[in-house]
Amino acid sequence: MASESETLNPSARIMTFYPTMEEFRNFSRYIAYIESQGAHRAGLAKVVPPKEWKPRTSYDDIDDLVIPAPIQQLVTGQSGLFTQYNIQKKAMTVREFRKIANSDKYCTPRYSEFEELERKYWKNLTFNPPIYGADVNGTLYEQHVDEWNIGRLKTILDLVEKESGITIEGVNTPYLYFGMWKTSFAWHTEDMDLYSINYLHFGEPKSWYSVPPEHGKRLERLAKGFFPGSAQSCEAFLRHKMTLISPLMLKKYGIPFDKVTQEAGEFMITFPYGYHAGFNHGFNCAESTNFATRRWIEYGKQAVLCSCRKDMVKISMDVFVRRFQPERYKLWKAGKDSMVIDHTLPTPEAAEFLKDSGGLTPRAGSEECPEEDVEAADQGEEGDVKRSLAKHRIGTKRHRVCLEIPQEVSQSELFPKEELSSGQYEMTECPATLAPVRPTHSSVRQVEDSLPFPDYSDPTEVKFEELKNVKLEEEDEEDEPEAAALDLSVNPASVGGRLVFSGSKKKSSSSLGSTSSQDSVSSDSETAESVSCQGQEKTGVLTVHSYARGDGKAATGEPSVKKKRSAPRSISEQELAEVADEYMLSLEENKKTKGRRQPLSKLPRHHPLVLQECGSDDETSEQLTPEEEAEETEAWAKPLSQLWQNRPPNFEAEKEFNEIMAQQAPHCAVCMIFQTYHQVEFGAFSQSCGDASEPAAQTQRTKPLIPEMCFTTTGCSTDINLSTPYLEEDGTSMLVSCKKCSVRVHASCYGVPPAKASEEWMCSRCSANALEEDCCLCSLRGGALQRANDDRWVHVSCAVAILEARFVNIAERSPVDVSKIPLPRFKLKCVFCKKRRKRNAGCCVQCSHGRCPTAFHVSCAQAAGVMMQPDDWPFVVFITCFRHKIPNLERAKGALLSITAGQKVISKHKNGRFYQCEVVRLTTETFYEVNFDDGSFSDNLYPEDIVSQDCLQLGPPAEGEVVQVRWTDGQVYGAKFVASHPIQMYQVEFEDGSQLVVKRDDVYTLDEELPKRVKSRLSVASDMRFNEIFTEKEVKQEKKRQRVINSRYREDYIEPALYRAIME
């Protein structure tokens, strides 16, 4: 049958069906029929019902229907990759929603054809967030309508409610969706990879995009490549319905897809593991729910579910396997039932249509139909009282709502003053006020996807066609080149508002004399040369700043360096202007050439890295002062005392450091930048250099912590190489050690081909015998280095964390182009080493939280334990400084201090505020954890909540034992016992004498850092018992200053006493 099914719809096109009224009557049978025609291969199909069929006579009476939780969809991103945040709004009626949707601010723009509207959608996705009336529980079908009634489809999914009495809102009950222009549903498959049905009752059309199930893994790999941070947090992060990827990006990476427009009165059917997304053209109303066939059972057994939220939809497959796959039930329970899903095969119910290869005819035989399996579930539907929904524990299919709006999203983003007019839709640049949620680390401005929308008329070509010119075009920005980042008064749109300078601004008219006039300059030529170089450094930069502002000429003011004997001549303004012009020209050329393969260019003479080298001759012997020596005793800095670049080179110290780091998981010098994050998040690694884990010799392969995107992202380019060089199928990579300096790296992180991975392998620096070369982007030695511009060297980890650094040869991870790093980034001072060095050196990164100015070198931050983790595109690394460390994260990882009776603590009072209180008594209570039959869970049950046995007398049930649980709604539900958890409880007493029993998570010691939510509700008294309210000393205030009447109005002045008498 496989070969037969492959001939059906081989191009995986979205198919449209027009059933007759007779064919339309049996829903499950018609679904089986369209699968026999190959409709399921596209992942999406359209069904146009007979003209005589209507689910509702009129929709004029629904204006008072309440939309309880509308969501405003705030979209951030660029270049075809977006993240959608749902912000819940107050309830409104359909009448109010329609009025908003049809207003000038939210209405559909004018368009002549669908392709034009589609282009406007993707270009203006981040502007003017629309409101979506999603997830409204209910149906608009009239009661007498039996055909394709979304409220009672009578498929095998109804067994969930029949067997367990469980209803899951939006899954086996219908949901209504009220849309407006630009409201979107992000890329996702259905919960548990079920089927879904969507009927558009009335209003404007809805556009759909679909990826065939057989190519779903490719879409997941693409999404994980662009959003590695989300992928690490949750394997099934696309189920969050927050990721929007444009069809242009799909075509660019060769992922097959198709698109279709759903008109009012039409059905859309999605199939298991069919990724789909789309948007509404204007005000409309749709109704949808999920259903299942026998083919789905295998998908449900293998579905990868969201792991970051326990209340996500999960359906127990036990009843389905037991009923429809009895021969495999025991194997499945033992975890040995493994089967590869063939996405091309239709559902078993389609066998009758494949036998005769004819059309859909009335069924003559008595062949079993899914309807009959669940017929009993519908009997007595009206007479029986339905079991109430346990709202606290049953997952519902709802859009993921942001509980807290990201702090970087301003109010102006949520409620822009005015929408783009029709003439502004061709804008290619996002306004400065509409920045992404996370501020950009790059000096390159965020640019909207301005590419012409391609024609996808033939999806078969989409599979193989590779776009050759998919790159952000910036022809319109020639008047404003990238060198604007050199201006000291950098605007936030250019640098993301994140490059903060500790020094004051220097005037562009400063002369060389004012910057380098040193009366005590010695007469030897070496010293004089260093003075000239210092003068060149400051004046060079200032002159370029003048050009960046568009002055058109260099700053005025004659050089006034006092020449001493053999001192070289000073640099003229004309030469500096030539340097600036040369640098500006190179920037423009670099922007227009292909990013990944362009050769390394030499750095301009005025570049900070060149100037640092020029002025470093007199600082190579820089010694630490006694005060600075004392600082080296800090815990994180002590092992690095011999590795600072301002100390004499010490190759043996580097080698010893590399050997120590090789012993620590993940045993790779490059992956170490994410070590702190994995320590805190997963508790996987040792805490200090001294705690060596397994010997390096025994560890030949480990899984790299750095996603491939970190090596390929360059700020604004979406050119990601999806291939991961030198990685095994299980995701691990070989570890290799340099025989000379002992640095240990993954072959994939350092770009070591398997042929070269041997005991004789040497790193690039040792191969070039450049043992005294240091990283030009930081201030520490040791680690894995690669060659950069002008024969300089950089740490691979520094190049990964600095967004603007670029790996020219991605596979070999070298050379590294640092010419695109904005000059203001070199002005930042590292908070860790600024006291250890007499001069500023290297290039810093900054904390990613808001506009936090905290800056540090990558290597310093890694050594000090700053948390760095993979971020989502267009960023690379998300950095959390010590000021923004989340207290809850530390508390959750076992860092809680012990508490004793009589200790003063802070806890939550019954009035909802936090007060200081005293621990009176410590007790231990036992809570039970169970998994309910519907897939939900509870971990805070009391023993008396188990009604199937007396747990107070007999103790907890055995693990895995089936139990009956009485829930808070009074109903009894089936569940399986997981474990019992003895929890330490604390009885605390407040100042007003009231006492509460709380868990450790709800108690804060006086030494702990309080979360913001606690600080904002912290008070010093309980129930009006204020400290010293009657004994507080009276505050003496100065008498009011006597008012002096203006002489011009003295005659008009009336004494207050006289005024009151007149008024009386």
Curated annotation (Swiss-Prot):
It comes from the Eukaryota. Its EC number is 1.14.11.66, 1.14.11.69. Residues 460-472 have a biased composition (Basic and acidic residues). The keyword Acetylation applies. Residues 897-954, 955-1011 form the Tudor domain. A zinc finger (C2HC pre-PHD-type) spans 772-805. Residues 509-525 have a biased composition (Low complexity). GO terms for cellular component: cytosol; fibrillar center; nucleoplasm; pericentric heterochromatin. A zinc finger (PHD-type) spans 709-767, 828-885. Signal peptide: none annotated. Fe cation binds at H188, E190, H276. Residues 142-308 form the JmjC domain. Widely expressed. It is found in: Nucleus. The modification Phosphoserine is found at S523. 2-oxoglutarate binds at Y132, N198, K206, K241. The keyword Flavoprotein does not apply. The modification N-acetylalanine is found at A2. Histone demethylase that specifically demethylates 'Lys-9' and 'Lys-36' residues of histone H3, thereby playing a central role in histone code. Does not demethylate histone H3 'Lys-4', H3 'Lys-27' nor H4 'Lys-20'. Demethylates trimethylated H3 'Lys-9' and H3 'Lys-36' residue, while it has no activity on mono- and dimethylated residues. Demethylation of Lys residue generates formaldehyde and succinate. Participates in transcriptional repression of ASCL2 and E2F-responsive promoters via the recruitment of histone deacetylases and NCOR1, respectively. PANTHER family: LYSINE-SPECIFIC DEMETHYLASE (PTHR10694), LYSINE-SPECIFIC DEMETHYLASE 4A (PTHR10694:SF119). This is Lysine-specific demethylase 4A. The gene is Kdm4a.
